[in-house]
UniProtKB/Swiss-Prot annotation:
Name assigned to this protein: Protein PA-X
Pfam families reported for this sequence: Flu_PA
Entry's free-text remark on domains: The probable endonuclease active site in the N-terminus and the basic amino acid cluster in the C-terminus are important for the shutoff activity. The C-terminus acts as a nuclear localization signal. The C-terminus is recruited to host protein complexes involved in nuclear Pol II RNA processing.
Gene3D superfamilies the record matches: Influenza RNA-dependent RNA polymerase subunit PA, endonuclease domain
Catalytic residues in the record: E80, D108
Keywords of this entry: Decay of host mRNAs by virus, Eukaryotic host gene expression shutoff by virus, Host cytoplasm, Host gene expression shutoff by virus, Host mRNA suppression by virus, Host nucleus, Host-virus interaction
Record-linked InterPro entries: PA/PA-X (IPR001009), PA/PA-X_sf (IPR038372)
């Protein structure tokens, strides 16, 4: 699974997922299913925001090839993928600027057009089950919930899907591709079956035991994406990189 993740996801996404797991004391080399799930969730969050802007009249528009002269503002602020301190700084700044109620839990996005935080979910189970779990945890009508599944199903608060159909179809296609790629490598069953995943986790732990006392080289390189607090993730370079990653995965 680890090899699959590194092959089929953009390196920036992989780096952010590793950083998030290490922040909670988790090892991507051992908890590989969680590693894959975090990368998938990150990519969906990025794809959700791609190409969506607000013009000078505060109208929502979709722009795939950016006009440098256009007065555009990113419609979505991505909170997911930042370290917790920076993420809460962004949330507090948004709340102070817009007057929106501060959420109890870190959301994934903020929608400047609808003035609401968004919680994105990607599930391997039934969408309505996962939606209810999210709603019970958040316990706030102010945070909008949007759930996607690997089977093409989706569910959102009050059936308000926020994005146009084409943008949502792009996300569903990517999730279906990830599922097909996992299945072709014999990884899908363990990804969706907790019992099989637990067996694989034990196997991973056992394979690492002889190396437990070996020194580990740690990289202190910081992702360029984490060096700024201004709205990001939607630039053409990142979009091109994600597309390249998507096409690479498709051709396998």
């Amino acid at each position: 699974m680890e090899d699959f993740v590194r092959q089929c996801f953009n390196p920036m996404i992989v780096e952010l997922a590793e950083k998030a797991m290490k922040e909670y004391g988790e090892d991507p080399k051992i908890e590989t299913n969680k590693f894959a799930a975090i990368c998938t969730h990150l990519e969906v969050c990025f794809m959700y925001s791609d190409f969506h802007f607000i013009d000078e009249r505060s109208e929502s528009i979709i722009v795939e090839s950016g006009d440098p002269n256009a007065l555009l503002k990113h419609r979505f602020e991505i909170i997911e993928g930042r370290d917790r301190t920076m993420a809460w700084t962004v949330v507090n700044s948004i709340c102070n600027t817009t007057g929106v109620e501060k959420p109890k839990f870190l959301p994934d996005l903020y929608d400047y057009k609808e003035d609401r935080f968004i919680e994105i979910g990607v599930t391997r189970r039934e969408v309505h089950t996962y939606y209810l779990e999210k709603a019970n945890k958040i316990k706030s009508e102010k945070t909008h919930i949007h759930i996607f599944s690997f089977t093409g199903e989706e569910m959102a608060t009050k059936a308000d899907y926020t994005l146009d159909e084409e943008s949502r179809a792009r996300i569903k296609t990517r999730l279906f591709t990830i599922r097909q790629e996992m299945a072709s490598r014999g990884l899908w069953d363990s990804f969706v079956n907790p019992r099989e995943a637990k067996r694989q986790l034990k196997k991973n732990l056992k394979s690492l035991e002889p190396c437990a006392d070996l020194p580990t080289k740690v990289s202190h390189r910081t992702s360029p994406a984490l060096k700024t607090l201004e709205p990001m993730w939607m630039d053409s370079n990142r979009t091109a990189a994600l597309r390249a990653s998507f096409l690479k995965c498709q051709k396998r």
